[in-house]
Amino acid sequence: PNAWDIGVCNNLLNMLAREKGVEYDAEGSIAKSGKIIDDLLDKMLSISYHKLPPPKSIGVEWIHKELYPLLDKVADHPIEDRMRTAVEYIAISIVNDSPKTGKILVTGGGAFNHFLIQRLNELADEVEFYLPESDVINGKEAFAFAFLGLLRWLGKPNVLKSTTGASK
């Protein structure tokens, strides 16, 4: 497989940030100020999705079903601690499901979370998490869909079962 959903990032972090009264955790500063809730982290990491072989895919409904109930059980903990635990969960999930050496291009809104990127680099000894220019980060999905459209226009396959897990 060439691509799959490792886990969640901004959907989870933004949901928690809204509890703090902000739309997102700018640069990861709220999460950085918290402490890890070990029991919560263990439960998040033991979710069966992480044991599935790629390709695999996650949607928002998965977050509601699998993660929100775990977070609800620790609602009495400060939001900073829940966010810190979420960042650690995301970073560990990414590192566990990524190549162990080389460079990995980081795109999407999570690339602007400096604390998440810091944790990725601290957890992965032989991997460099590379951040492209902000235009590339912001435009990733538009670029991808434009490329898929071009392939379709040229009459070439634009969906590969090795990437999506489709049967044909």
Q: Positions of the model-derived regions?
A:
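Short hydrophobic/aromatic-enriched beta-strand-loop microsegments
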Residues: 2-6, 126-132
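Acidic-glycine-rich active-site phosphate/pyrophosphate-binding loop
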Residues: 62-70, 115-126
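Catalytic-loop motifs flanking and including active-site residues across diverse enzymes
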Residues: 8-13, 86, 116, 138-141, ...
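Glycine-rich phosphate-binding loops at beta-strand->alpha-helix junctions
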Residues: 102-120
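Phosphate/pyrophosphate-binding loops at sites that engage ATP/ADP/AMP, CoA/4′-phosphopantetheine
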Residues: 94-102
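Conserved ATP-utilizing enzyme core subdomain
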Residues: 2-87, 91, 154, 158, ...
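A structural micro-motif
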Residues: 22, 102, 125-128
